[in-house]
């Protein structure tokens, strides 16, 4: 029997050229952690197989860190999931040209379902859709606007053949209050596609709980603030997740 492994994706969120973490996705709640490349290379050195790289300025529609992200991806030897502001053909193709293994669509999937369905058809498992949730309402545009009912949007994405979902409880993100296990369980009951959890991971115990969902279709977890805050190290987390 294959051992159940939870993939871990340490996050590097970039705003104004710096690696930062937000609390509940609020602009202005940033804590800066220095150069993004230093953070990304540190996670690679610690054994990460993935890095979750986010352009917050693009997500909030206030600019872009494209040149810097290109430099980060070029220096890494691990897989990169790229997120933030990918809303049309130009930004999607640009993200894939950077060398990202996978691209997260957020706002676009809510605001332009026709384009999203076409992107999924064209690029298959290179596309993941980020579902950022408050209760069962989706948040759009850097989490500042409502994006509709989670289950209605999920049904539409299932019909479009979406390959993977990244599910974030916005109320938990950056708070170190633990992941929303109930939301993830509901999501896993409604899709056969792999799901990646994001938001709230605060302890190794949280990762134990998430790993228990792997047999039900949870593929991985994005870990951010807990690593930066020193709640645990990435090697410790990888051990708990079943890697190494």
UniProtKB/Swiss-Prot annotation:
Disulfide bonds: none annotated. Its main location: cytoplasm. Its EC number is 5.3.1.16. One of its GO terms (cellular component) is cytoplasm. GO terms for biological process: L-histidine biosynthetic process; L-tryptophan biosynthetic process. It catalyses: 1-(5-phospho-beta-D-ribosyl)-5-[(5-phospho-beta-D-ribosylamino)methylideneamino]imidazole-4-carboxamide = 5-[(5-phospho-1-deoxy-D-ribulos-1-ylimino)methylamino]-1-(5-phospho-beta-D-ribosyl)imidazole-4-carboxamide. The keyword Ribosomal protein does not apply. Keywords: Amino-acid biosynthesis, Cytoplasm, Histidine biosynthesis, Isomerase. GO terms for molecular function: 1-(5-phosphoribosyl)-5-[(5-phosphoribosylamino)methylideneamino]imidazole-4-carboxamide isomerase activity; phosphoribosylanthranilate isomerase activity. It is found in: Cytoplasm. Pathway: Amino-acid biosynthesis; L-histidine biosynthesis; L-histidine from 5-phospho-alpha-D-ribose 1-diphosphate: step 4/9. The keyword Amino-acid biosynthesis applies. It holds the Pfam family His_biosynth. InterPro entries: Aldolase_TIM, His_biosynth, HisA/PriA_Actinobacteria, Isoase_HisA-like, Isoase_HisA-like_bact, RibuloseP-bd_barrel. It comes from the Bacteria. The active site is at 13 (proton acceptor), 132 (proton donor). This is 1-(5-phosphoribosyl)-5-[(5-phosphoribosylamino)methylideneamino] imidazole-4-carboxamide isomerase. It comes from Renibacterium salmoninarum (strain ATCC 33209 / DSM 20767 / JCM 11484 / NBRC 15589 / NCIMB 2235). The gene is hisA.
């Amino acid at each position: 029997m294959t051992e159940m492994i939870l993939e871990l994706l340490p996050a590097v969120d970039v705003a104004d050229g710096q690696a930062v973490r937000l609390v509940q996705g609020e602009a202005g709640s940033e804590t800066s952690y220095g150069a993004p490349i230093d953070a990304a290379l540190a996670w690679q050195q610690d054994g990460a197989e993935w890095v979750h790289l986010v352009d917050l300025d693009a997500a909030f529609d206030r600019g872009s860190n494209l040149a810097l992200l290109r430099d980060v991806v070029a220096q890494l030897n691990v897989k990169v999931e790229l997120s933030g502001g990918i809303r049309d053909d130009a930004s999607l193709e640009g993200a894939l040209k950077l060398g990202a293994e996978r691209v997260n669509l957020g706002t676009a999937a809510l605001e332009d379902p026709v384009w999203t369905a076409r992107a999924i058809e064209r690029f298959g498992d290179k596309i993941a859709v980020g579902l950022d949730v408050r209760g069962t309402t989706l948040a759009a545009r850097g989490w500042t606007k409502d994006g509709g009912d989670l289950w209605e949007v999920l049904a539409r994405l299932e019909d479009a053949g979406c390959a993977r979902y990244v599910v974030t409880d916005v109320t938990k993100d950056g708070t170190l209050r633990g992941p929303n296990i109930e939301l993830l369980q509901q999501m896993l009951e409604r899709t056969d596609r792999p799901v990646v959890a994001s938001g709230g991971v605060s302890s190794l115990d949280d990762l134990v709980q998430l790993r228990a969902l792997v047999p039900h279709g949870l593929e991985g977890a994005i870990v951010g603030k807990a690593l930066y805050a020193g709640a645990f190290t990435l090697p410790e987390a990888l051990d708990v997740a079943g890697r190494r």
